[in-house]
Amino acid sequence: MAASTAAQVQLSEEALGLARIFENPKGSLEAASKLLQKNHDEFHVFWRDVGGHNHIPHSVLSILALGGGPAELQRAWDDGVAIQRPTPPLDEDVVKKLENPAEFRARIGSIPNYTNFLHFFRNQMDKKGWQAVVSEYAFSRTPLAETIFAQLFEGAYHPFIHIGFGIEFNLPSIIAEGLAQAATHDSAGIEGFFLEAERQAAQSKGPGKSLVQLLDEVRTTEKIKTAARLPDGPVRVRDGVIGRAGAEIAALASQFRVPADQLSRGAAESINISAYTAGAAQRAGKARKIDFFHMHNTTSSLFLTVFLNQPWISTEDKVRIVEWKGRLDLVWYAACSAPDLNVDHVIGYKPAQSAGWGWKELYEAINVAHDDGHLAKIVRALKNGEEVSRPFESGEGAEAFPIKGDSWLKLAQMSYDTTLDLPDDDKWIWGAGFLPLWNKVPSL
């Protein structure tokens, strides 16, 4: 049997990522391809069943886009490799069975089936091409595709991010990993939320609302704001927001609607608001600290640009991607207990270690900073946000775009300054609306 072409990692000069500033040193593509191939062949997409997403591909590809060379790419690998675990065993009989939609559905959410799904999607790509496979299993509107499309947004957007990297860098192997991650991810119950919000949006005759307005409504709707509780831990969305205020959050989120002729603006608004929640959710008297989950709203926002750039995705599906992303950002804001938002925390930020830097200096520093990939991802997403948001930051409707001008760089500097040289768990605050979590953040 011929080797799977979708199993091979081969980066090319034609697809080196968004938000680039300078070129990579010689040998960078070969080094990155080698590391990504080793990860693909040896490691599970989950290093832990709950919340244990393998970030090695994210980190390596982010550093590549930031202009890193072989040494910096190796640093990205080294910072993520210790926690990884091997792939589960392969069962060729199961791989064959996955061609049956009923057999496929029966194994959704089964992490031990990751390798089987990975091989299944690679086989499908070898036969049909990766665009056709993504279209069939995420965008075809079949019952199975509806579930997988929702699953892309599970786990704080990780399958969406993973597939997005694969599409951005034209790597079918990474796309197959992301689809297999989506298929095996545990569920937070967001499929029902998405479909109900979409149903209500379709029935609505009135105008929609901006995400800024809807964030305010989340914060002032007591049932939604208090739905997630600290003891919920990793199930703040499933048992908290969806479990205790599912009807209310669906009705609220349904009001974010994107007309097809305003697709670019809608995506830019979502990208801007993800950055707004990341930077503006601070606590008076405390040092700046970015919320871990709002950070994921931001890192995933870059892939709105990636998906919108794909000519093979229909306008209708692009609208759906933007709407679902914006609606889920509202859920995650509620899951963090809807902290007060004040953009002055970003506008007035005084950089520390990064004082006087521009984007180039920041990129260079991030390439060598010890991190699991989150820092590189958020900073690159912010640079992309600066570019796509700029046309909408003034003029009519500009109030829907609170992050403007040099605030993008300031927020990127804040991301660097507040995480540098800290253990991974201390780099971020894990729920900015929960007062007890600020106790470990230094006072000013």
From Swiss-Prot:
GO-annotated molecular function: oxidoreductase activity
E.C. number: 1.-.-.-
Obligatory cofactor(s): NADPH
Keyword Oxidoreductase: yes
Keyword presence, tRNA processing: no
InterPro entries (alphabetical): Questin_oxidase-like
Pathway field: Secondary metabolite biosynthesis
Signal peptide positions (record): none
Keyword annotations from UniProtKB, A to Z: Oxidoreductase
Induction trigger: The cluster is expressed in rice fermentation medium. Three regulators are located in the cluster (ptaR1, ptaR2 and ptaR3), suggesting that the production of pestheic acid is controlled by a complex regulatory mechanism.
Similarity comment text for this entry: Belongs to the questin oxidase family.
Functional description taken from the UniProt entry: Baeyer-Villiger oxidase; part of the gene cluster that mediates the biosynthesis of pestheic acid, a diphenyl ether which is a biosynthetic precursor of the unique chloropupukeananes. The biosynthesis initiates from condensation of acetate and malonate units catalyzed by the non-reducing PKS ptaA. As the ptaA protein is TE/CLC domain-deficient, hydrolysis and Claisen cyclization of the polyketide could be catalyzed by ptaB containing a beta-lactamase domain.
Protein name: Baeyer-Villiger oxidase ptaJ
Organism: Pestalotiopsis fici (strain W106-1 / CGMCC3.15140)
